[in-house]
UniProtKB/Swiss-Prot annotation:
Pyridoxal 5'-phosphate binds at A86, R87, N192, S215, G216, H217. This is O-phospho-L-seryl-tRNA:Cys-tRNA synthase. PANTHER family: CYSTEINE DESULFURASE, O-PHOSPHO-L-SERYL-TRNA:CYS-TRNA SYNTHASE. The modification N6-(pyridoxal phosphate)lysine is found at K218. The lineage of its organism: Archaea, Methanobacteriati, Methanobacteriota, Methanomada group, Methanococci. Belongs to the SepCysS family. InterPro entries: PyrdxlP-dep_Trfase, PyrdxlP-dep_Trfase_major, PyrdxlP-dep_Trfase_small, Sep_Cys-tRNA_synth_arc, SepSecS/SepCysS. Pfam families: SepSecS.
Length: 380
């Protein structure tokens, strides 16, 4: 067999160690230093299964069973299971409580994985309206309109799905309003918290939520792939139905899900999560400061204003203008940031970009702001 494996040796990554990373998809998944030591204990394949009696969520050593109970309290739900990510959590709900051909009513900012999950479950969808440019906010009342439309057309509705915070604009949807609509109409309500649970406080019961899909690697300071599905006890029998052949195994979990480093890193980071969501107001303040400081340069923040989440999307005509005369063209901004020890902005992008300063210190935030100011002022 002629295979050269040298390229797989000594693989390194210096973005997090040597640079300030502004990538929104990564800011919430950074593991705290004190939690990293657990990796050395559990990096072997089935290391969490030393004392397993048949199911991941029932393991007592390490205390996965207690952790999941505590996580339910943290999210304001009844029962929690580990998954491989928010997309798998959504699919587990759709595949268990909906019938083939049912409709999922979901928001216009829904993540692509919501569509992939419902397609895989052989479901249909009805998309609700969102505000036009530049806010793109979810319109809660549109849910009632779409539900009425489907009911009048004799279409079966299986699920109401809302993206709590979308990844495109970082808008925080009005969950309580949509939850009240779902409850009044009598439909189960799934909240996609991939960009919220673990970053900001969540209380599923207060929000009238039946299911929460969370992402460990995106927003809960965990190694990937790792997610959580939290449910109300009302849906326990449907979502957590067990196999007729292997009676201890839950069907939607395919027996066991995220095992090894992903689930253990999430457990080790739990104390960190509990403390950091208490400081959410400070994260919002930092984000608003970035917007207020950079907009006078010629950046235009799109999405709801003022910011209520750490994701920032800027239109940047000033960068596009500089790119026209700079010999590096669209790569100049990436390269100038890299010189200053800043990464996470896509290479070659000048018309618009997304960023986040979640978890950065005030000193780091000021450095990012001043670095972008210096780039614009030097090259404009």
């Amino acid at each position: 067999m002629d295979i050269n494996t040298d390229k797989y040796k000594n693989i390194t990554r210096n973005l997090e160690r040597e640079m300030i990373n502004l990538n929104p998809i990564q800011r919430g998944g950074i593991i705290p230093t004190e939690a990293k030591k657990i990796i050395y204990e559990y990096w072997d394949g089935y290391s969490v299964c030393d004392y397993c009696s048949g199911r991941l969520d029932q393991i007592e050593t390490p205390p996965i069973n207690e952790f999941l109970e505590d996580m339910s309290k943290f999210l304001g739900m009844d029962i929690t299971r580990p998954t491989h990510g928010a997309r798998e959590s959504k699919y587990a709900v759709m595949n268990s409580i909906c019938k083939e051909g049912d409709y999922v009513v979901l928001d216009g900012n829904a993540h692509y994985t919501s569509y992939v999950a419902l397609e895989r479950a052989k479901l249909n969808y009805e998309k609700t309206e969102i505000e036009e440019y530049p806010t793109f906010r979810v319109i809660p009342e549109s849910y009632a309109e779409k539900i009425d439309l489907l009911e009048d057309s004799k279409k079966n509705i299986g699920l109401i799905l809302l993206t709590h915070v979308d990844g495109n604009y970082g808008n925080v949807a009005d969950v309580e309003k949509v939850g009240k609509i779902a409850k009044s109409k009598g439909y189960p309500f799934l909240l996609n918290c991939a960009y919220s649970a673990g970053r900001m406080p969540i209380d599923g019961k207060k929000l009238n939520v039946d299911f929460i899909a969370a992402s460990g690697h995106k927003s809960m300071a965990a190694s990937g792939p790792c997610g959580l599905l939290s449910i109300n006890k009302k849906y326990e029998d449907e979502v957590l139905e067990t196999s007729k052949v292997n009676v201890v195994k839950e069907l939607q979990m395919l027996g066991c899900t995220s095992r090894g480093i992903p689930i253990l890193s999430l457990m080790a980071s739990f104390e960190h999560l509990i403390e950091r969501v208490k400081k959410w107001d400070l994260e919002v303040e930092k984000t608003r400061k970035v917007v207020n400081e950079l907009e006078p340069l010629g950046f235009n923040q799109i999405g709801e204003k003022p910011r209520n989440h750490d994701i920032i999307r800027f239109e940047t005509p000033i960068l596009d203008k500089i790119a026209e005369k700079d010999k590096r063209r669209g790569f100049f901004f990436y390269e100038e940031l890299k010189k200053r020890g800043i990464g996470g902005i896509r290479r070659g992008v000048t018309k618009e970009f997304k960023m986040s300063v979640y978890g950065l210190t005030n000193v780091q935030v000021d450095y990012v702001i001043n670095s972008m100011k210096s780039i614009i002022n030097e090259l404009r």
